[in-house]
Regions:
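Long helical/loop segments within the catalytic core of UDP-sugar-dependent glycosyltransferases
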Residues: 95-97, 107-108, 113, 121-201, ...
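Conserved short acidic donor-positioning loop in nucleotide-sugar-dependent glycosyltransferases
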Residues: 47, 64-65, 92
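Short, acidic, metal-binding catalytic loop of nucleotide-sugar glycosyltransferases
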Residues: 45-56
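Catalytic donor-sugar/metal-binding loop of nucleotide-sugar-dependent glycosyltransferases
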Residues: 210-227
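Cell-envelope/extracellular polymer assembly enzymes that use nucleotide-activated donors
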Residues: 25-28, 58, 207
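Juxtamembrane C-terminal module of membrane proteins
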Residues: 6-24, 258-266, 298-418
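A conserved acidic beta->alpha catalytic loop
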Residues: 63-72
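N-proximal low-complexity "stem/linker" segments adjacent to membrane-targeting elements
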Residues: 1-45
Length: 418
């Protein structure tokens, strides 16, 4: 996040929405679930506890061909509560499950909720007030992770927080381009006009938001509502998630790059494209320089027959210093420059975040920020590089029930043999 963005956010205060809902609308909450036996119970308990008239609430769980006990657990709740409906279908992916649920819903308001995400009791009321106050068609919440025990989870905690603050700025430009899975609120009229979720798109939440933007629907980001979600707890799962997000952005950017919203087209898309170029490029430059300098250093050791005694004895000589300090030269300068920029950003970020989240101590926020500072450049560069590789050479990649085959090599082969 850039310095000018954070300076802008320093002046941001939570906006109190003084709006009374005179008549509560019928709300249908669609919960797509695939192998969510560990999470579905907690999610349903939280939905039952929502502060909303139960005669105006409809919870629809769509089991998307789970291989665990997700369906059985959900059915137990259906038997207890008349406002819960549970369906089971063949595995077809999240979009397919969402569409299945929406087509069987009756609410004038549709809420999508990932089965591993948890709303607060007042989340729905706040989101609806936000929707009516701003006359919005879609309202998107902030998202934060539940678990922060592992380093990989602490990294994601800060990453989500940064995205939340970015959302505030993007919202000011009327350029919200993701209707995230955890508790996005839609007017039914949106789906009636532009259709349901794209079942072939691996980033359906981005695609539906961009399609709504293209059709001039108003999307608002509601930072006052923070939905908790379960993050990937290992690097392999995180890599798979972020590669999917990156491929989804590339596909959706290609599809909607001519969108009329100039702020979205030129600024939001532009910044993302620049990052997708600079991050892997910087990473590869650093990797190359480290490799070259290490090679030169090992070459020097070889020239002295790996005589460690000679090396230690002459370790302060000019020649050896040249080899040693080359390891800390240009590549480290690039890294230090990035670190200084990020450090300034995080000092500002920490001061803002404490206004926003009182649950973490100053020490925790600083600790998490240091972890993010250390990993962010490398992680994001790796995510982008792997995604670009798949975009060029990937054949048939599967995410849930969706098979992604939108790579350059597949297009060339289809053109050649199609």
């Amino acid at each position: 996040m850039s310095i000018y963005t954070l300076l802008f956010l320093l002046s941001y205060d939570k906006e109190e929405i003084n709006y009374e809902i005179k008549e509560y609308p019928k709300v249908s909450i669609i919960v797509p679930a695939y192998n969510e036996g560990k999470n579905i119970k907690n999610t349903l308990e939280r939905l039952i506890d929502l502060e909303y008239p139960k005669d105006k609430l409809e919870i629809i769980v769509v089991d998307d061909g789970s291989k665990d006990n997700t369906y059985e657990i959900a059915k137990e709740y259906e038997e207890k509560y008349n406002f819960i409906k549970v369906y089971k279908k063949e595995n077809g992916g999240k979009s397919s499950a969402l569409n299945y649920g929406i087509s069987r819903s009756s609410g004038e308001i549709i809420v999508t909720l990932d089965a591993d995400s948890i709303p607060e009791k007042d989340s729905l009321i706040k989101m609806l007030k936000y929707m009516y106050y701003y006359n919005a068609d879609i309202v998107v919440p902030a998202i934060q992770t539940i678990n922060t025990k592992k380093l990989i989870e602490k990294y994601q905690y800060i990453d989500y927080a940064i995205h939340n603050f970015s959302g505030i700025v993007i919202d000011k430009m009327n350029s919200v381009f993701i209707a995230s899975g955890p508790f996005s609120v839609f007017k039914r009229s949106v789906f009636e006009k532009i259709g349901l979720f794209d079942e072939k798109n691996i980033s359906e939440d981005m695609e539906i938001a961009l399609r709504a933007q293209k059709n001039n629907f108003k999307i608002k980001f509601c930072p006052e509502v923070i939905i908790k979600t379960v993050p990937p707890d290992n690097f392999k799962s995180l890599l798979k998630q972020r590669v999917r997000w990156t491929l989804g952005f590339i596909d959706n950017y290609t599809k909607y790059r001519d969108i009329e919203n100039i702020y979205l087209r030129e600024i939001v898309f532009g910044i993302n494209i620049i990052l997708y170029v600079l991050l892997p490029l910087s990473f590869l430059i650093i990797l190359y320089m480290h490799g070259k300098q290490l090679y030169d250093f090992l070459k020097y050791l070889s020239s002295i027959n790996y005589d460690i005694y000679y090396f230690i004895k002459n370790s302060f000589s000019f020649d050896i210093n040249t080899y040693i300090f080359q390891l800390l030269s240009t590549s480290q300068l690039i890294l230090i420059t990035f670190s200084i920029i990020l450090l300034i950003n995080f000092l500002l970020f920490i001061s803002i975040y404490k206004r926003y989240d009182k649950s973490k101590s100053w020490l925790s926020i600083i600790y998490y920020s240091v972890i993010y500072l250390f990993f962010s450049i490398y992680f994001n560069a790796i995510f982008i590089i792997v995604a670009i590789y798949y975009k060029l050479f990937g054949r048939n990649l599967r995410w849930g029930g969706i098979v992604w085959n939108n790579s350059l090599i597949n297009k060339l082969l289809n053109r050649k043999y199609g």
